Design a protein with these regions (language model features):
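Bacterial N-terminal signal peptides that target proteins for export
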Residues: 1-8
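N-terminal signal peptide c-region/cleavage motif recognized by signal peptidases
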Residues: 15-17
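Short, surface-exposed binding/anchoring microloops in extracellular/periplasmic proteins
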Residues: 21-58
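A short, structured loop/turn motif at beta-sheet edges
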Residues: 32-36, 60-67, 91-97
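The feature marks short-to-medium sequence segments in extracytoplasmic or secretory-pathway proteins
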Residues: 53-78
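Residues lining hydrophobic/aromatic ligand-binding pockets adjacent to catalytic sites
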Residues: 59-61, 86, 113
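Short, solvent-exposed, Trp/other aromatic-anchored flexible loops in extracytoplasmic proteins
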Residues: 69-100, 104-109
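Edge beta-strands of extracellular beta-sandwich domains
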Residues: 110-119
Length: 122
């Protein structure tokens, strides 16, 4: 019986990381700061649990996949949810009228809610 409890406890610990879910992009604001350069303010929601499981970056991508900009998140935001961070200097090719913003966490990688946004002035 004791071994059943140990197995159950191990399974519970292994599954705990999955409960935080994937990192979701919930809002994006884009501003042109000159020429083909833009600033992104991105709001994420993720149930950060600490250094082992937190949203560690978000990216601006072209619809066909190339990454145009990455904002690294250096620490967990356990007590600050949702949270907004900015990235300036994102170069967007002239032919793109929309981009996709996606978030990444240390356990699940990509896969949460993404936001497709129109590029101002295009």
């Amino acid at each position: 019986m004791k071994s059943a409890y140990i197995i159950f406890a191990c399974l519970l610990l292994m599954c705990t990381a999955a409960f935080a879910g994937e990192a979701d992009v919930i809002e994006v604001e884009v501003r042109r700061i000159g020429g083909d350069t833009y600033k992104f303010d991105v709001t994420l929601r993720h149930a950060d649990e600490g250094w082992e499981h937190f949203a560690n970056k978000w990216e601006v991508t072209a619809p066909d996949g190339p990454v145009l900009g990455t904002r690294v998140l250096a620490h967990p935001h356990v007590e600050e949810q949702p949270f907004t961070r900015s990235l300036s200097g994102v170069k967007i090719p002239e032919n793109l009228t929309e981009v996709i913003v996606r978030a990444h966490d240390l356990v699940h990688g990509y896969g949460g809610k993404t936001v497709e946004v129109k590029v101002p002035g295009k």
